[in-house]
Amino acid sequence: DRLSSLTPTIPLLSEESDAIDYSLRKSWQRYWLIDPLDGTKEFINRNGEFTVNIALIENGQSVAGVVHVPVTGISYFGGIGIGAWKQNINQLDNEVQLIVSQAMQENSGVRIVASRRHLGEQLDALVEKIENHFGKATLLSMGSSLKMCLLAEGSADIYPRMAPTCEWDTAAAHGILCAAGGEIVDLQFRPLR
């Protein structure tokens, strides 16, 4: 309700709200996309890896996002043209600007982050290909949109998504990742929109 009152002319779409058919909203030039609880299984399992996601979508592209981790008080936020940041609510004077990791150094290995819910043969095959090409590969399993936040802060190099996903699960972190200098691509390495 507060976001709607702050920006009354911008529609709001949430995973938890009534469904708005794509045929109606595809003409929206700008809207808020919210996932009030990303990582439901992580929330149920009380592992701390669930988030609140808010994205601003313009012309079909995530241009700004906020990913908040309630358990730790850490927020990731950013947008196109303003950069990306990480901040702990308990240390408001200690913002950290996010920049994706630089090109991997030879023999440094690849840091792969993956969903603990979607590990399997496809991921194993990809990890093997990466190891054959780059050498060492380190796999970190994590829940929710935190995986893309690790990319944005430079703590991981790649996040292969092998299972279906919904726009509210990725939009906020996508905006942050792009603001930090990263990108999400499809299997043909085209930027995802």
What are these regions (language model features)?
Residues 1-37, 125-128, 132:
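N-terminal subdomain of lithium-sensitive/metallo-dependent phosphomonoesterases centered on the IMPase/IPPase/PAP
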Residues 3, 12, 40, 69, ...:
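Residue-level signal for inorganic ion chemistry
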Residues 29-31, 63, 110, 157:
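Conserved acidic residues
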Residues 32-49:
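Glycine/serine-rich anion-binding loops at beta->alpha junctions
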Residues 54-148, 192-193:
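Acidic beta-strand-loop-alpha-helix segment within the catalytic core
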Residues 125-133, 140, 146-193:
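Oxyanion/phosphate-interacting regions
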